[in-house]
Regions:
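Membrane-core helix-loop-helix motifs of multi-pass transport proteins
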Residues: 129-221, 354, 377-410
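Short helix-coil transition sites and intra-membrane helix breaks within transmembrane domains
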Residues: 23-27, 61-63, 74-84, 111-123, ...
Length: 424
């Protein structure tokens, strides 16, 4: 396609989208409006601008289909009480003395098995408030522990962001998940270190904020069955060279999980809930696709590459930098991963970086500043433990350190050590 938008148009598309999101316009509409105005200002006529937007949205459709079917597993985990049971078991096994480590690991595990980061934090939040009250730990410490764990789990999970980067760079979902394991482990370590330093900084939990949870939950074995089945099916590719698409593996895990818990009659209810959760993500990705269509056909890539060269950075630095910038612009890991991988992916691989390393570095980069205040994650996580705005804002740099640590490790590990042809 020969339609070209100026770098100014692409930047304005991003800026307008961010401004509208801050003004509480629905993010999908904000992205579409930003893309439209940016394309027109960038020199394309109305017809060409719409064409670019449509083509960008089309590029998201296969990822959207996989994300929608992943709703079966997510719905089962959340609605059946399986996610709560997994978190409670991990925390009880590690004990009160290792409270922050327990919160970090429990949120990481929940996210790693397919629960959204914000939902994982909200799920663990009631338990964290009780622990914080008993251990005299501040809200800042427990929230950072949960968010850091969630960020670590997010880069090794079959979540929408992982699906988006694997699809856009034509590498298997399993490969991207495995490539994130080492960075995720270091992410957990740095989270535990920083959260420990925050135990006496910030506000403490009041007695009235602790809510007892008397909800009946399934056994741990039945709760973990669904995620284990899904991960097992995805792992058949590297183990036995049997490729089972996430489109099949994730819902099958959800179905087997609900059978294991003896709640088959509620499968439709759980699946409907999961679909409702994924629908918002799918719609957001359509809006993201329109923005990606404008940016990918603009001179912005050349400007960023030129800037990297001017700073003397290596060419592969474009991968994590694009992830950081796009996730920060959209305040969303999923949107950032989708835009960065679809817009910059082919350019990065043309510079000699393997598709898998590109996917992993973009993915890790998207965890650095995806928590900015113009996104929903900032507010939903803070609200889960009744944290005030000022205290929540002070956590952003610490969250960024966790994401940046994982990004640096990802660059060191995936680009410098993984074989260029490795794709499992």
């Amino acid at each position: 396609m020969d339609i070209q938008v100026s770098a100014l148009g692409a930047v304005l598309a991003l800026a307008i989208s961010i401004f509208l999101i801050i003004k509480k316009i629905q993010p999908a509409y904000a992205l579409i409006i930003g893309a439209l105005i940016g394309g027109l200002i960038g020199g394309a006529n109305l017809t060409d601008t719409v064409t670019l937007m449509m083509n960008g949205a089309k590029g998201m459709m296969t990822a959207i289909l996989r994300i929608l079917t992943a709703g079966v597993l997510a719905g089962v985990l959340i609605q059946s009480g399986a996610a709560t049971k997994i978190a409670e078991t991990i925390i009880s096994k590690l004990g009160q003395n290792r409270a922050l480590i327990a919160l970090t690991i429990s949120t990481m595990v929940l996210t790693a098995v397919g629960v959204f980061v914000d939902v994982a934090v909200i799920t663990v939040a009631p338990i964290s408030l009780e622990i914080a009250r008993k251990s005299n730990i501040t809200k800042s410490a427990i929230l950072l522990a949960m968010i850091g764990g969630g960020k670590a789990g997010n880069i090794i999970s079959p979540n929408p962001n992982t699906i988006a980067v694997s699809e856009n760079l034509n590498v298997s979902l399993t490969s991207v998940m495995i490539a994130g394991i080492i960075p995720a482990i270091l992410g957990v370590v740095i989270t535990c270190i920083i959260s420990k330093r925050l135990t006496k900084k910030g506000t403490y939990v009041e007695a009235a904020e602790v809510i007892e949870n008397n909800e009946m939950t399934p056994s741990f074995l039945s709760a973990i069955t669904g995620p284990l089945v899904s991960i097992g099916l995805l792992m058949l590719r590297p183990i036995a060279n049997i490729s089972i698409d996430p489109l099949i593996a994730l819902p099958v895990g959800g179905i087997i999980g609900v059978i294991a818990m003896g709640k088959l009659k509620k499968l439709n209810e759980y699946a409907s809930f999961g679909l409702s959760k994924m629908t918002g993500v799918a719609i957001l990705l359509i809006g993201t696709g329109t923005l990606a269509g404008i940016i990918s056909n603009s001179a912005l890539k050349d400007v960023i590459i030129s800037g990297i060269n001017t700073l003397g950075l290596p060419s592969f630095a474009l991968a994590p930098i694009s992830g950081i910038l796009m996730a920060g612009a959209t305040a969303s890991t999923t949107s950032g991963a989708a835009v960065a991988s679809s817009v910059f992916g082919s350019t990065i691989t043309s510079l000699g970086v393997s598709s898998l390393a590109t996917a992993a570095m973009i993915h890790a980069g998207c965890t650095v500043i995806d928590q900015l205040p113009h996104g929903s994650f900032f507010h939903s996580t803070g609200g889960s433990i009744n944290m005030n705005m000022n205290e929540r804002l002070k956590l952003i740099p610490f969250e960024a350190i966790v994401g940046l640590t994982m990004t640096i490790i990802s660059v060191s590990y995936t680009h410098l050590t993984l074989p260029t042809t490795w794709n499992v």
